[in-house]
């Protein structure tokens, strides 16, 4: 239903995230529905590319699909600290499997602003994997969920990326468990939902411009 309405709502691309999307045993069917119409990206930790899920992944149409795989560092230390012991080796194996299987892969790291050396080592690993710059994403830590530090997010400070969950519509997927970022309960009709978010975003920008120009000194 979401994909059907997105066709007429000026949607340009679809991202599927979680949790872990590959825990859905029928994800391949959902992906094939989405990729027929939109460029589609799945955000995954690549840790469950085994058994039946691996077989189903191999049957997914590679056209219009990107697997965005989380890898926070070039060695297990930091990544495993974030995501659990042994997760680095599984993620790296998943990245290599996806590349070898002909999928477009983007690798994403969540790092603090002071992660200079870690970031350099991470980029070196991406070089070894022959990933281009547009196949690499570095996101800063947001003060959301279990994080006790990081960038503070609000609807006024964050460019919206409409996020639909079973609980409702959120301003952005990075804050999809934050009550203050929840826009409304129902996503349908999607075109109206997107219009509501655009209108609020415009108001935030107008207010920001007014504040920015309130004290001219030159």
What are the residue ranges of the model-derived segments?
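A broadly tuned preference for mixed-charge, low-complexity surface segments
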Residues: 68-76, 91-100, 124, 156-166, ...
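Conserved C-terminal portion of the radical SAM core fold
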Residues: 9-15, 37-41, 64-68, 86-148, ...
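Generic detector of well-ordered alpha-helical segments enriched in charged/polar residues
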Residues: 58, 76, 80, 119-123, ...
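Canonical radical SAM enzyme core domain
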Residues: 1, 19-61, 71-77, 81, ...
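Accessory C-terminal segments flanking Radical SAM cores
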Residues: 141-218
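A short, N-terminal amphipathic alpha-helix
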Residues: 2-9
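Short C-terminal domain-edge/linker segments immediately following a structured domain
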Residues: 45-47, 71-74, 96-104, 137-140, ...
